[in-house]
Every structure is written in structure tokens, then in C-alpha cells.
């Protein structure tokens, strides 16, 4: 079992910068190497729980540059034979020097208000019905 993140209601999409994606890949590196050393196995039939989160990873690029998108679904799915693909981040990832951070700010779009707390690496979304925040570790 490999737990990546725990996300609450309404916060099902997360985009990482390429430098954070490199660090994420590094954490998976030990697991990738361990899996590569394992021989073929015949796991027993296990009942799958329906309430576990699933994350889909997507390497994409937009006007701000390349990024690694992560979308939460219902059950976690990291196929072991596909973990080696995370090493592609070596081709696209960059090492960044720590930058001087700007002050936090907020932005209103339609009926949502987003608060950006740069010092704690947090983005909060406020709607009339609920407030939700993401904290990104570096």
C-alpha cells in the first residue's frame, strides 16, 4: 500500500511544479528499485475496497510551463509495472534554487475566492458553501 495524499471533498485535482515532481519521483525511487528486484508473484484474490482514493498522474504543459497533474478518483492505482515511468521526470525535471517568496494574496474568480499563502505553501478555495485548502510539501 502506497499512500500519496489525503484530499477532502471538492479538492480532487493537484498540480505539482516540475521541481516538486522530481522530489516526488525520488520518494518513489526506493519503491521502484525494490519492485524491480521482486520476482513474478501470484497474489491472492483480494476484495477491493470501494472507498479508497485513486490518483491519476498526467505530465502536461500549459502557458506557465510543464507540470505534473494529479487527479483524485475513488481508489488508489499505481500499477507496479508503470512505476518505472516516473523516471521520465529526469528528462523534464529541473533543480531550482530556493527563491525569495512574495507575500500571500487572494484572487476572486466568479463565485470563488482563492487565498495563496506562499509562506506555508498553501492554497485555500472559498465558496459560499464551504472552504477547502491544499498544502503542498516541498
Swiss-Prot record:
Location of this chain's protein in the cell: Nucleus
GO biological process, one term: nervous system development
Modification Phosphoserine occurs at: 70
Protein biosynthesis recorded as keyword: no
Pfam family, one: PurA
Gene3D superfamilies: 3.30.2450.30
Gene Ontology molecular-function annotations: DNA binding; DNA-binding transcription factor activity; DNA-binding transcription factor binding; DNA-binding transcription repressor activity, RNA polymerase II-specific; double-stranded DNA binding; double-stranded telomeric DNA binding; mRNA regulatory element binding translation repressor activity; purine-rich negative regulatory element binding
Keyword RNA-binding: no
Gene Ontology CC terms, in alphabetical order: cytoplasm; dendrite; glutamatergic synapse; neuronal cell body; nucleus; postsynapse; postsynaptic density
Record keywords, A-Z: Activator, DNA-binding, Nucleus, Phosphoprotein, Transcription, Transcription regulation
Function: This is a probable transcription activator that specifically binds the purine-rich single strand of the PUR element located upstream of the c-Myc gene. May play a role in the initiation of DNA replication and in recombination.
UniProt record similarity statement: Belongs to the PUR DNA-binding protein family.
Oligomer status and interactors: Homodimer, heterodimer with PURB and heterotrimer with PURB and YBX1/Y-box protein 1. Interacts with FMR1; this interaction occurs in association with polyribosome.
Official protein name in the record: Transcriptional activator protein Pur-alpha
